[in-house]
Amino acid sequence: MYLIADWRRTHYSKDVIPEMDGQEVTLMGWVHSIRALGKLAFVILRDRAGTIQAVVPKQKVDEETFEIAKKLGKEDIVAIKGKVVANEKAPKGFEVIPIEIRVLNKADAPLPLDPSEKVSAEIDTRLDKRFLDIRRPKIQAIFKIRSEMLKSIRKTFADEGFIEVNTPKLVASATEGGTELFPISYFEKEAFLGQSPQLYKQMMMAGGFDKVFEIAQIFRAEEHNTRRHLNEAISIDSEMSFVNEKDAMAMLEKVVYNCYSDIEYNRPNEIELLELNWEIPEKTFDKVTYTEAIDIAIAKGVEIEWGEDLSRAAERAVGDEMGGLYFITEWPTQTRPFYTLPHKHDNKVCKAFDLMYKELEISSGAQRVHKYDLLVQNISNMGLNPDSFETYLEAFKYGMPPHAGWGLGADRFAMVLTAQDNIRECVLFPRDRQRLTP
């Protein structure tokens, strides 16, 4: 066994090309596979960027190097210093002949999970051994695309003059008055894990920040057990002053469009590896009102009445009709939180919207109430006590501008981008009703 000592990686696997014939390289990673055939050994080394083949001919390497190569096991951690040799018959037009191999760590055998993907495993098994599962190239591709998504979103917000903020995740009361909260002991008080940064975003509008965004955890104590729900999720939230819901929708369109464009440009290998049918959407998405969505659902045989939230059957019906990315707008006021602004001409309808991808909701937003008296009235009308929102309401007494915003589910959006049908595939260590480890 060796320490890394004075060795340092000089290249990732993807950086080595046939034109480097004769050049010395130092590679580091995992043994993806090993074949020893008499006086010849083939070692496939895997790193973050892909795989590369090292060929170990007994007559061209010293005896110690050949013996080390023969005894390698799958997933051993190795460092290989060798020379690039152009070879048209090799898989990538070259191979690496080792000068020295250092075994940095041995992997136990048998492996509880096969990162080479030759043996499939159920998702629960994969999540139990997630550290092995994420070695798989296709799983890494999901998270590289997710990383590119977050990078693109931050860049778009920065280009548009937004300030990134961090709001508390330990809170004294519910954001929306709901019961979907995780209570915790906070010294001598009861506290909760935050279910949304919504109230804080609005308070920052009163503070004159004008445009803010946050990318952070939210916690929902919902007893769902579906492929699209988790109890800990990443939410991408934004809020803007002196705008309405249409401006907020336009900003969301820009964020989503730029994600598709940036991923196509920066992650073509991952798109190919996942065999994604990649299409950059139009810059402006289709829109359908809630009333029109209800009509579509009823026409397709779904039993639903105006004023009800859309059921799964209704979402599927509308998704089948609309396809791709689209907004549902002008929701019934009774279906939305107290801070949503009703339409002036018809207070039964509010200035709220959802962004859908087929049948999946990925974002929700609205123009907010910015008048103190109306906000207090809305809170009371929903059976909540305004006193519970005292610190929030105070921000509306001393000059709150009109404002609007939205929250985009990062995990669900990653599902859409990578064409996964289970949200757990897009979260490193998902938390649901059954899973609290690893």
From Swiss-Prot:
The site (Important for tRNA non-discrimination) lies at P91
So which domain of life are we looking at? Archaea
Amino-acid positions noted as binding ATP in the UniProt annotation, renumbered to this chain: R220, A221, E222, R228, H229, L230, E361, G409, A410, D411, R412
Q: Where does this chain mainly localize?
A: cytoplasm
Record's subcellular location: Cytoplasm
Its UniProt entry gives the catalysed reaction(s) as: tRNA(Asx) + L-aspartate + ATP = L-aspartyl-tRNA(Asx) + AMP + diphosphate
Name recorded for this polypeptide: Aspartate--tRNA(Asp/Asn) ligase
Cofactor(s) needed by this chain: Mg(2+)
